Regions:
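Bacterial Sec-dependent N-terminal signal peptides
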Residues: 1-28
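Active-site segment of extracytoplasmic enzymes that catalyze sulfate/phosphate-ester chemistry
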Residues: 23, 42-131, 135-141, 155, ...
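Active-site-proximal cap/lid insertion segments
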Residues: 27-30, 37-53, 60, 69, ...
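Short Gly/Pro-enriched turn/cap motifs at secondary-structure boundaries
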Residues: 74, 125, 353-358, 411, ...
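Short active-site alpha-helical segment characteristic of glycosyltransferases
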Residues: 132, 148, 388, 420
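Acidic, glycine-rich loop-and-strand cores that form catalytic or ligand-binding grooves
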Residues: 408-429
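Active-site beta-strand termini and strand-to-loop segments that position acidic
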Residues: 449-452
Length: 510
């Protein structure tokens, strides 16, 4: 029986090095699957030291690939972190620097026994600046995005259908993604004849309220539905046409909710003394029981999905020519009843999501490509999400992307990343490095700069300096002892920050 209904919407720098790809590839371009999970901390995986949570498939990926220890998200929160991937710009330059919402103060529409927003989404990517899917389309790649978009609101100039994406299924809006049993999901599918993003209504879910005990009578679980759509898309691919898939899972972001199956039950038995949480309706977080079991189950469920992706690639004979990346958009959260201290989710780093301390931005990052990326390798190269655009361009053979795609008519346009393809392919001597890495986030009024072992965090205009080699937890501010380093990093901030009318930050005194 068909359970979903569709409705249509209207809405209010570096030069690439393609020779790095191994000669045995010849003309064939590699496929790329970029798996981005949501709010996973540096210490959430067994291969990064997590003692409680079972992640056998991701651990195997690490054993067969390269695990990075100093990889950084683009921002300590979702939308701007994703923006740095898509735009190749850090948060001092990219247009989207925060989770600006577009569902506030819009009319409501009825879904069964519920009301929901008529328009949802976040600040759009600047349509004058090229993003990754558009570059891949120009190179002849098939493009798919499955999960969270967060790069434009419904009807805006930056929805998947307008930004080089062939197939999209998931959440246009990250706020909507707080419900794992939603009223609707978004879809754009050329193969189904869509000409714009549509809403696919979850007919079974909307029979029950969005909040309260009856919410858990809903059965259409978005994480599984989105994952199945991704598997269907991979199943349609072949060795004759290169493809790139952005699998942007919402797990393990709050709310803490999932099917009552063996994954959850195993953790309920493991954590005998567990917590409950009362819910937060205005954030769309329903109440949760067994919060430790719920959270652990969400990560193991994600790990199961990763295993199914690898199985599908092998079944299709695509595994040897597919680069797979696994990472997280930012550090761990404590919303919805999550308990990062219990799990040691920060990996012994200071700070959580929304903070420019290490715990908010240092993330797990694993790269896998048989016969190209050295199995079982661990790498301490320092890089950030805005380096992924040049990296992917190198791997895909997109030549001179910065020169080709910089919009000379857009003031200040350009790209900030450096390709890490040499590192991935074992050519360390050819790897270029940043002088420093840069972050800023307006909600907590913080700026972060890292140069080598030195790390500056500016909080409400006040600089704090740490030496990560001796103080990984960022406990000891040594700014007064090293004025020359402070001066150097302040100069970096002055150079890298470009004012934004929507995302304002307090700059330090220069």
């Amino acid at each position: 029986m068909k359970t979903n209904k569709t409705i249509w919407l209207t809405g209010v720098g570096m030069i690439c090095l393609p020779t790095l790809v191994c000669a045995k590839q010849n003309v064939q371009q590699p496929n790329i699957l970029f798996i981005l999970c949501d709010d996973m901390g540096y210490g959430d995986l067994a291969c990064y030291g997590q003692p409680y949570i079972h992640t056998p498939n991701i651990d195997q990926m690490a054993r067969e690939g390269m695990r990075f220890t100093q990889a950084y998200a683009g921002s300590p929160v979702s939308a701007p972190s994703r923006a740095t991937i898509m735009t190749g710009q850090h948060t001092g330059h990219t247009h989207v620097r925060g989770n600006k919402e577009y569902w506030r103060n819009v009319p409501m529409v009825k879904y069964g026994v519920n009301e929901d927003f008529s328009v949802v989404g976040q600040e759009p990517y600047d349509p004058q600046h090229k993003i990754l899917p558009e570059m891949f389309k120009d190179k002849g790649y098939r493009t798919g995005v499955f999960g969270k978009w967060a790069g434009g609101y419904e009807g805006s100039a930056s929805t998947p259908d307008k930004r080089g994406v062939d197939e999209f299924y998931g959440y246009i809006c990250q706020f909507q993604a707080h419900l794992y049993y939603p009223n609707f999901l978004n879809r754009y599918s050329k193969s189904q004849g869509d000409t714009a993003v549509v809403r696919e209504i979850m007919e079974q879910n909307i029979q029950y309220p969005m909040f309260g005990k009856d919410y858990f009578k809903r059965k259409q679980y978005s994480a599984r539905i989105i994952h199945d759509k991704a598997l269907e898309w991979i199943d349609k691919q072949d060795s004759q046409h290169p493809f790139v898939g952005f699998l942007t899972y919402t797990l393990p972001h709050a709310e803490l909710a999932q099917p009552e199956d063996s994954i959850l039950e195993n953790y309920q038995k493991k954590f005998f003394e567990d917590k409950t949480w009362g819910g937060q309706e205005d954030s769309r977080y329903n109440a949760a029981v067994h919060t430790h079991a719920q959270f652990a189950g969400m990560i193991t469920r994600l790990d199961q999905y990763v295993g199914e992706i690898f199985a599908k690639l092998k079944e299709k004979g695509l595994d040897k020519n597919t680069v797979v990346i696994f990472t997280s958009d930012n550090g761990p959260h404590e919303e919805g009843g999550a308990d990062p201290k219990f799990f040691g989710r920060d990996g012994k780093l200071k700070g959580l999501k929304r903070q420019c301390y290490e715990g908010g931005i240092r993330i797990p990052f694993i790269a896998w490509w048989p016969e190209h990326i050295k199995a079982g390798s661990v790498n301490d190269t320092q890089f950030a999400f805005y380096d992924l655009m040049p990296t992917f361009c190198d791997l895909a053979g997109i030549k001179n992307f910065a020169k080709r795609y910089t919009n000379k008519k857009l003031a200040g346009d350009g790209f900030d990343g450096i390709s890490i393809a040499p590192t991935l392919l074992g050519k360390d001597a050819e790897q270029k490095h940043h002088e420093y890495l840069y972050w800023e986030f307006h909600e907590t009024d913080q700026i972060g700069v890292r140069k080598g072992d030195w790390k500056m965090v500016v909080v409400k205009g006040k600089p704090h300096l740490y030496n990560l080699a001796s103080d990984i937890h960022e406990d000891h501010n040594v700014a007064t002892e090293h004025p020359e380093i402070v001066k150097e990093l302040l100069a970096a901030i002055q150079k890298e920050h470009r004012d934004s009318k929507d995302f304002k930050i307090t700059l330090p005194e220069f």
